[in-house]
C-alpha cells in the first residue's frame, strides 16, 4: 500500500510538498512486513513516467533540456532523462529560488561534465524556448509557462500543478496522459480546462499505456 500526501503550500514553509510511505504486506496472510519511505519511490516513479513519454514522443535528436523547478523532482527528471538521452548537451534551469537553482547546478555539473548548465532565474521563456524537452516540476497555482515559450516540435512534460497557461495545451499537436480517466478530475491545467468545457475527452490523443 502506498500513502502519499501533497501540500503545495509547504514550499512557503521551506519543506517538501510531497511525502509518502509504503507498507509491504505478506501476500498470503496480509500481515505487514515493512514500512518504507515512499517519497523517494514516488519521485522515481514520476520521473520514470516522464521518461516513458519522452522515449516515444521526444524529438529525434535531444540536445537541450529546459527544467522549470530545481527541487527533488526536477533533479530526478534530469538524472533519468540524461540517462535516457546521453545526447543532452545543455540543461537550462529556472527557479524562483536562486539558492535552489545554484544547488541544482552544483550537484550535477561535476557528475555530467559534458553538459552545459544555464541558470535562468525566473525567466521561464529563456529556459523553455528552443529546448527539445521542457519539464515543469513545480507546484505553481498560477501559470509561469506561456504558449510562446514552446517551440514547435518540442516535448513538454507537465509534472506539477497549474504552471502553464491554457494556450500551451491548445497549441499542442498531441496531448498524451499517463491515465486521463484517473487524472482529469484533479487541478492540473488540462483538468481545469476539462472542467471549464475547453478540453474534451476526445482531445486527449492517448494514454501512455495504450
Model feature map: region roles:
Residues 138-140, 160-161, 180:
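Short glycine-/small-residue-rich Rossmann-like dinucleotide-binding loops
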Residues 74-75:
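N-terminal Rossmann-fold NAD(P) dinucleotide-binding loop
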Residues 169-210:
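Adenosine-phosphate binding glycine-rich loop
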Residues 126, 133, 139-157, 167:
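Rossmann-fold NAD(P) dinucleotide-binding segment
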Residues 57-64, 87-88, 151-152:
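Short helix-loop-beta connector
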Residues 83-111:
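NAD(P)-binding Rossmann-fold cofactor-contacting core
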Residues 69-71:
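Glycine-rich Rossmann-fold phosphate-binding loop(s) that bind the pyrophosphate
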Residues 1-43, 51, 58-61, 206:
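N-terminal ligand-binding/catalytic initiation module
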